[in-house]
Regions:
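Terminal alpha-helical segments
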Residues: 1-136
Length: 136
């Protein structure tokens, strides 16, 4: 499969995961909302790395994915400032994501809503930087 098609597929999967997060929030499946929102962020970052390099990243976790994307885009300084600003939020996502995978019903509505809001903020930042950098 060509890289542009694969990138498009990953972005569609990410958007589906984001919709799933909303659906899970509305039905009270808060741990699944967190898992879906995490997948949304991961897939969007991975898609943007693949779009620029032609390779899927071999790293795990949001920190490493974001650092890899910063390097690929040549925007380390901008990402560094953003990561410092959202450090506690990313730690919250990583901790709650891990807990949500292990224990059903492990988070509250408020935690899940916060999780989704942070996921949207991260993806919004990424998309703004990608747009600023321009086409691959």
């Amino acid at each position: 499969m060509s890289t542009p098609r694969l990138v498009g597929r990953m972005i569609r999967r990410a958007q589906e995961a984001r919709k799933s997060a909303d659906a899970n929030l509305s039905t009270g499946l808060f741990n699944l909302a967190c898992i879906s929102a995490y997948q949304f962020v991961q897939l969007m970052i991975r898609a943007r790395i693949l779009e620029r390099t032609g390779l899927e990243p071999n790293v795990k976790g949001l920190w490493e994915l974001l650092r890899t994307l910063a390097e690929v885009l040549g925007k380390q300084e901008e990402f560094s400032r953003f990561l410092e600003e959202v450090k506690a939020d990313i730690e919250f996502l990583e901790e709650l994501y891990g807990r949500s995978k292990k224990e059903p019903s492990s988070c509250t509505r408020e935690e899940a809503e916060k999780f989704v809001m942070i996921a949207d903020r991260i993806v919004g930042f990424i998309e703004n930087v990608v747009e600023e950098v321009g086409p691959a």
